[in-house]
UniProtKB/Swiss-Prot annotation:
Protein name: Fluoride-specific ion channel FluC
Origin species: Shewanella baltica (strain OS155 / ATCC BAA-1091)
Regulation (activators, inhibitors): Na(+) is not transported, but it plays an essential structural role and its presence is essential for fluoride channel function.
Protein topology in the membrane: Multi-pass membrane protein
Pfam families in UniProt: CRCB (PF02537)
Family note: Belongs to the fluoride channel Fluc/FEX (TC 1.A.43) family.
Compartments (UniProt record): Cell inner membrane
InterPro entries in UniProt: FluC (IPR003691)
Gene designation per UniProt: fluC
Catalytic function, reaction form: fluoride(in) = fluoride(out)
Residues annotated for Na(+) binding in this entry: G74, T77
GO cellular component, one term: plasma membrane
């Protein structure tokens, strides 16, 4: 039950961070491209890489993984919003932005998970 509460706590924090980051990005860049979703996915992917690598080296507790890895990062990042925003761009006929959204999210997120892992593993 302890881990369930940690996931819930981390999830509530991650959801609030995602909301605030998305609002900030809209204020800075406007709403013509989903920069907020891209940023939270890229940031969350980097942090997930760090958490994974630390977990591989047994430097973090299962409780920390529940709080941060599952809760906070699970709520911070969002595949469903990414999918919906991409579909909306397609429905608006903006194939270029839709394609850019898919390519940037997938390539940057994969790279950031790798970068996070390498950052930790190189410090061993």
């Amino acid at each position: 039950m302890n881990n369930l509460l940690l996931v819930a706590l981390g999830g509530s924090i991650g959801a609030v961070f995602r909301y605030l980051i998305s609002i900030f990005m809209i204020q800075v860049f406007g709403s013509s491209f989903p920069f907020g979703t891209l940023l939270v996915n890229v940031l969350g992917s980097f942090l997930m890489g760090v958490i994974y690598a630390l977990g591989q080296m047994s430097h973090i507790s299962p409780e920390f993984k529940a709080l941060i890895g599952i809760g906070l990062l699970g709520a911070l990042t969002t595949f469903s919003t990414f999918s919906n925003e991409t579909l909306l761009l397609l429905q608006e006929g903006d194939w270029l932005k839709a394609t850019l959204n898919v390519v940037l999210n997938l390539s940057l997120c994969l790279f950031m998970v790798y970068l996070g892992q390498q950052l930790v593993f190189s410090r061993i």
